[in-house]
Amino acid sequence: EYAQFEDRAPVTTRKAYWVMTYNIGFGAYQRDYSFFMDGGKYSRARDEESVIADICGVGDVINNTAADFVFLQEVDIDGTRSYHVNELELLNEFVTGYYYTFAQNYDSPYLMVPPWEPHGANKAGLVTYSRGEITDALRRSLPISDSFSKFTDLDRCYSISRVPVDNGKMLCLYNVHLSAYGSSEEVRSGQLGMLFADMKADYDRGNYVICGGDFNHNLRTDASS
């Protein structure tokens, strides 16, 4: 899914741009919130009002930051855990002047865990906002585990949004949220290998590449490398 509008803002070379990446945690993560799969207490947001307040806060952060490109993860469009608030629609009421793409990367059946407060059924995805015109967008499915964790990893993917640059090249915006819970090294390596191969292919074509998102693990044990 993507949206366009008439006011086209060209992306130019030799200009500094601001980039923001933000896992918004389905609108649940307040200061004292802890998620059950991280060893915490909760599986859902506190209530509908808190979800709406948190998402409005995310919109304020984006507007106040005035980033040119924004990568968001865990944006629910319909979920038990977020009280069926369509967070994409709510964000778009606050965030103006952007083109955007949405790529669904989570579509779970009704999960009966934890037993005291089931996580429920949820649909969520990746949202990419761009001041420059997005002329092409692609969703790429990632390999996932065959273990029980596949029920929390359904439809893992990354999105590629392409923005024309004034020199004829493309700016390729990669938005990613890799597997976290129970994933094997083989799954992690497969996901990163696929992502890096696509990024390199775009780079080798002479395009510009920016990747933002939640990798769920350190990409390098030695940051200097």
In which residue ranges do the predicted regions lie?
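Alpha-helical scaffolding within the catalytic cores
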Residues: F5-E6, C56-V58, D146-S147, D155-I160
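Active-site metal-binding loops of divalent metal-dependent hydrolases
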Residues: I24, V75, V176-L178, G213-F215
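Beta-strand-turn-beta hairpins that frame and shape the catalytic cleft
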Residues: A9-V19, N122, L126-D136, T152-N175
